[in-house]
Design a protein with these regions (language model features):
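Short, charge-rich amphipathic alpha-helices with coiled-coil/heptad character
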Residues: 1-17, 89-98
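Extended alpha-helical coiled-coil "stalk/arm" regions
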Residues: 27-52
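Short, glycine/alanine-rich amphipathic alpha-helical segment
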Residues: 47-70
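Charged, alpha-helical coiled-coil and adjacent rod-like segments in eukaryotic scaffold subunits
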Residues: 52-58, 86, 93-98
């Protein structure tokens, strides 16, 4: 692969990594809020012992769990892109040395 192509791919991967990290930061904040909401709903369900409060807790927990899965997916994407970036950097160094 040519040096210019490697540099272009590195730039693309770097831009995507930046965007994913920003999205991950937003998701972290949203997840914290959803977990707090689910915890509050759990306490209300324990105190009130009503079916409605129980359903609200279940729904809030489901939202928090879905966001946690989304966060895990994003973190996996970041890891894959970081590995790809490392590989591209290794190839670029090898290209420059040859």
């Amino acid at each position: 692969m040519s040096k210019s192509l490697l540099e272009r791919r590195l730039t693309e991967v770097g831009d995507r990594l930046k965007a994913l990290r920003e999205e991950l930061a937003v998701v972290d904040e949203q997840l914290a809020a959803l977990v707090e909401t689910a915890d509050d709903a759990r306490l209300r369900a324990l105190v009130s012992e009503t079916p409605l409060a129980g359903r609200e807790h279940t729904e809030a927990r489901r939202h928090a769990d879905a966001m946690a899965r989304h966060r895990a997916d994003l973190a996996g994407d970041v890891e894959r892109l970081e590995r790809s970036q490392d590989e591209l950097l290794d190839r670029l160094v090898a290209e420059v040395r040859s």
